[in-house]
Amino acid sequence: MKFAVIVFPGSNCDVDCYYAVKDGLGEGVEYVWHQEKNLSKYDVIMLPGGFSYGDYLRAGAIARFSPVMEAVREEAEKGKFIIGICNGFQILTEAGLLPGALRKNEGLKFICKTVSIIVENDKTPFTTRLKKGQEILLPIAHGEGNYYVDDKTLKELKGNNQIVFRYKENINGSVERIAGVINKKGNVLGMMPHPERAYDSLLGNTDGLYILGSIVDNFVKGGV
C-alpha cells in the first residue's frame, strides 16, 4: 500500500508523517505537493500538521482552496482513508469534509505537551487496535485546537458515533473535550493530537502506532 503525505506551504509535520509510515509501519509513502490534482494512485492520504499558508485568516482557511483539496474530496467520496492531523484537521473542517471548527485555545496560548486521550469509538478503521475507554498518550502542539460545534451538530455527532477521541482533561476548551472526529461514512478522520510523533520508543512512547497500524490492518481487510 502507498501513503500520500500532502505538503502545503507552511507544513512542518510532513517529515514526521513520512517517517512514521516508512519506519514505523514499513509501508510505501511519498510527499505530494499541494498543487497536485490527482491522488488516485495512493491508498491513504495524510494531511499533516503545521501552519499552512502561515495560518493567515485562520488555520486551514487558505489551504482548503489548494488544488489538491479537490482531489482529496474525490478520494474521500471513493471511500479512501484520509487522516488530518492538527493543521490537517483544521483544513478538513474548513473544506467541509468534517463538521465543526477549530478555534483559538481557551487560554489563548500555544500548548505543546503530551496528554492523555480517551478512545470513544473503537469501530473505525483508525481505531481497531484500540478499545473503547482505553487511555493513550499522544503529543499535542497547537494554538487553535479548541473544537467547536453547535448543539444540533453535537447531538448528530453523538448519535452517529462520530466522536472518536476525547481529551481526558479540558486542555483547550474543546466542546465536551473532543480531540478527534470522523465523517459519517467512516473514512475521514480529523484529530488534533499527533500519532506520528509517537511511533518509536525513542520519541517517548509508541501509542501512535495503534492508530496508524489500524489503518494498515483495515486497508488489508478491504476498507470501511
Curated annotation (Swiss-Prot):
The record's InterPro entries line, in alphabetical order, gives:
Class_I_gatase-like, PRibForGlyAmidine_synth_PurQ
Q: Which GO terms describe its biological process?
A: 'de novo' IMP biosynthetic process
Q: Name one GO molecular function term.
A: phosphoribosylformylglycinamidine synthase activity
Reported EC number(s) for this entry are 6.3.5.3, 3.5.1.2
SUPFAM superfamilies this protein is in?
Class I glutamine amidotransferase-like
- Glutamine amidotransferase type-1 domain: from which residue to which, for each copy? 2-224
Q: Does the keyword Heme apply?
A: no
Catalytic activity line of the entry: N(2)-formyl-N(1)-(5-phospho-beta-D-ribosyl)glycinamide + L-glutamine + ATP + H2O = 2-formamido-N(1)-(5-O-phospho-beta-D-ribosyl)acetamidine + L-glutamate + ADP + phosphate + H(+); L-glutamine + H2O = L-glutamate + NH4(+)
UniProt pathway: Purine metabolism; IMP biosynthesis via de novo pathway; 5-amino-1-(5-phospho-D-ribosyl)imidazole from N(2)-formyl-N(1)-(5-phospho-D-ribosyl)glycinamide: step 1/2
**Keyword hit for ATP-binding:** yes
Compartment list: Cytoplasm
Give a Pfam family name. Answer: GATase_5
Recite the UniProt keywords alphabetically: ATP-binding, Cytoplasm, Glutamine amidotransferase, Hydrolase, Ligase, Nucleotide-binding, Purine biosynthesis
What is the active site of this protein? C86, H194, E196
Q: Tell me which domain of life the UniProt entry assigns to the organism this sequence originates from.
A: Bacteria
Q: Name one GO cellular component term.
A: cytoplasm
Question: Where is this protein chiefly located?
Answer: cytoplasm
What's its job?
Part of the phosphoribosylformylglycinamidine synthase complex involved in the purines biosynthetic pathway. Catalyzes the ATP-dependent conversion of formylglycinamide ribonucleotide (FGAR) and glutamine to yield formylglycinamidine ribonucleotide (FGAM) and glutamate. The FGAM synthase complex is composed of three subunits. PurQ produces an ammonia molecule by converting glutamine to glutamate. PurL transfers the ammonia molecule to FGAR to form FGAM in an ATP-dependent manner.
Quaternary assembly: Part of the FGAM synthase complex composed of 1 PurL, 1 PurQ and 2 PurS subunits.
HAMAP family listed in its UniProt record? PurQ
Query: What protein is this chain from?
Result: Phosphoribosylformylglycinamidine synthase subunit PurQ
| UniProt source species | Caldanaerobacter subterraneus subsp. tengcongensis (strain DSM 15242 / JCM 11007 / NBRC 100824 / MB4)
